[in-house]
Amino acid sequence: MVLTLLKAKPERKLAKQICKVVLDHFEKQYSKELGDAWNTVRDILTSPSCWQYAVLLNRFNYPFELEKDLHLKGYHSLLQGSLPYYPKSMKCYLSRTPHRMPSERHQTGNLKKYYLLNAASLLPVLALELRDGEKVLDLCAAPGGKSLALLQCAYPGYLHCNEYDSLRLRWLRQTLESFIPQPLVNVIKVSELDGREMGDAQPETFDKVLVDAPCSNDRSWLFSSDSQKAACRISQRRNLPLLQMELLRSAIKALRPGGLLVYSTCTLSKAENQDVISEVLNSYSNIMPVDIKEMARTCSRDFTFAPTGQECGLLVIPDKGKAWGPMYVAKLKKSWTT
């Protein structure tokens, strides 16, 4: 049940294979939800040779020579100066072509100079608008890219990175150790709590909360190596919105009145995105949506957004020359009255 990808070069081994079970499932769902846009999205998602990788520079071990080299290679700075909130301390570079820098190896005691990521994953971080001294919770933090990006934006008074999965928690710890200097580690707490329990454990504690929720993860699901497991995942997919809603309820409890919450996923699924946010807004009188449409207008040079069906959020969809996403982002504010 696997469709083989065409080789980029004849002598190379096949790096990835598309799982037909997943592709057929996505075809049925997303052709309805995205309309004609799905054709381009599908072409990008099923062609890893088209994928792009952004380079997030580490301000704690700044690679000046690498930055010069990126400029020479035609990379440009992400969104610099185009958003009301874009910290000068955060430097991320993009290439219009699908070029990937080599990953740095983890070496104990040596900080890495850069982190490779899907550029769209920085939008939830920017939407959170973290300021120096604030208490922030990254509820589902592994593998750590968004926690790392938050620390490129500001010096929080307290950063709580939580991850329930023990294997992913190890990955999170290694990411933080690889990029963050020891003095700053003192303001970071890493925990292994079920995210659904965080609100009861730390009620009204945080100024800002990021919920980068477990989701269908369309890019990786398309390349599932085991068709039977993929079919099982698809059948269990209907349970994800319930989990996402429970995580959001917990996050809202943990958020102080007046605080901001950003919800994000890396799936195109309306059920896991807009429908979840709509349910939250219908369930809480003290939770209000924050309009982030301006982000789409100012980011259109680097990202393509789904044109319809995103009343309370933004959905980045992969496009030709802008192969970023999927990434859904919604921003909420907790009022002082209940």
Curated annotation (Swiss-Prot):
Family matches, as CDD domains: AdoMet_MTases
Localization in the cell: Mitochondrion matrix
Binding site for S-adenosyl-L-methionine: 140-146, 163, 194, 212
Family matches, as Pfam families: Methyltr_RsmB-F
UniProt superkingdom: Eukaryota
Enzyme class: transferase
Keyword Methyltransferase: yes
Record's GO cellular component terms: mitochondrial large ribosomal subunit; mitochondrial matrix; mitochondrion
Keyword S-adenosyl-L-methionine: yes
Keywords: Methyltransferase, Mitochondrion, RNA-binding, S-adenosyl-L-methionine, Transferase, tRNA-binding
SUPFAM superfamilies with a match to the protein in the record: S-adenosyl-L-methionine-dependent methyltransferases
EC number: 2.1.1.-
Active-site annotation: 266
Gene Ontology MF annotations: methyltransferase activity; tRNA (cytidine-5-)-methyltransferase activity; tRNA binding
Biological process per Gene Ontology, one example term: tRNA wobble base cytosine methylation
Reactions this protein catalyses: cytidine(34) in mitochondrial tRNA + S-adenosyl-L-methionine = 5-methylcytidine(34) in mitochondrial tRNA + S-adenosyl-L-homocysteine + H(+)
UniProt record similarity statement: Belongs to the class I-like SAM-binding methyltransferase superfamily. RsmB/NOP family.
Function: Mitochondrial tRNA methyltransferase that mediates methylation of cytosine to 5-methylcytosine (m5C) at position 34 of mt-tRNA(Met). mt-tRNA(Met) methylation at cytosine(34) takes place at the wobble position of the anticodon and initiates the formation of 5-formylcytosine (f(5)c) at this position. mt-tRNA(Met) containing the f(5)c modification at the wobble position enables recognition of the AUA codon in addition to the AUG codon, expanding codon recognition in mitochondrial translation.
UniProt-recorded name of the protein: tRNA (cytosine(34)-C(5))-methyltransferase, mitochondrial
Gene designation per UniProt: NSUN3
